[in-house]
Swiss-Prot record:
The keyword Transferase does not apply. It comes from Gluconacetobacter diazotrophicus (strain ATCC 49037 / DSM 5601 / CCUG 37298 / CIP 103539 / LMG 7603 / PAl5). GO terms for cellular component: cytosol; small ribosomal subunit. The lineage of its organism: Bacteria, Pseudomonadati, Pseudomonadota, Alphaproteobacteria, Acetobacterales. Located at the top of the head of the 30S subunit, it contacts several helices of the 16S rRNA. In the 70S ribosome it contacts the 23S rRNA (bridge B1a) and protein L5 of the 50S subunit (bridge B1b), connecting the 2 subunits; these bridges are implicated in subunit movement. Contacts the tRNAs in the A and P-sites. This is Small ribosomal subunit protein uS13. It comes from the Bacteria.
């Protein structure tokens, strides 16, 4: 199992698929890395030589922000918005949708599980 950027890459998958296990590397960046290092896209991770793994590791470390650094940057951006007190920061602070979605109905992912209103019972006739 190859270890790149602190992540164990599955050995039986293709290189472009395996690189996507790293936070911050998606389909496009994985294909770009393979193209720049001239690694065939259909090659499996277990078929890579130690030299190729080292080249991948060096390229990712030098040119891409991944894993811990990227997570920290995203968290700091959100914290900055909250400290500014701007609209987006307030929405983050309150746990509501940030990008203008409706909240009267829906938005359950961001707001959490719906809680029934206690004490509101059906009136008997």
């Amino acid at each position: 199992m190859a270890r790149i950027a602190g992540v164990n890459i599955p050995t039986n998958k293709r290189v472009t698929i395996g690189l996507r296990y790293i936070y911050g590397i998606g389909e496009t960046k994985a294909e770009e890395i393979c193209r720049r290092l001239e690694i065939p896209a259909e090659r499996r991770v277990n078929e890579l030589s130690d030299d190729e793994i080292l080249k991948i590791r060096e390229l990712i470390d030098s040119e891409y922000r991944v894993e811990g650094d990227l997570r920290r940057e995203v968290a700091m951006n959100i914290k900055r918005l909250m400290d500014l007190g701007c609209y987006r920061g307030l929405r983050h602070r309150r746990g509501l949708p940030v990008r203008g979605q409706r909240t009267h109905t829906n938005a359950r992912t961001r707001k959490g599980k719906a809680v029934a209103i206690a004490g509101k019972k059906k009136a008997t006739r």
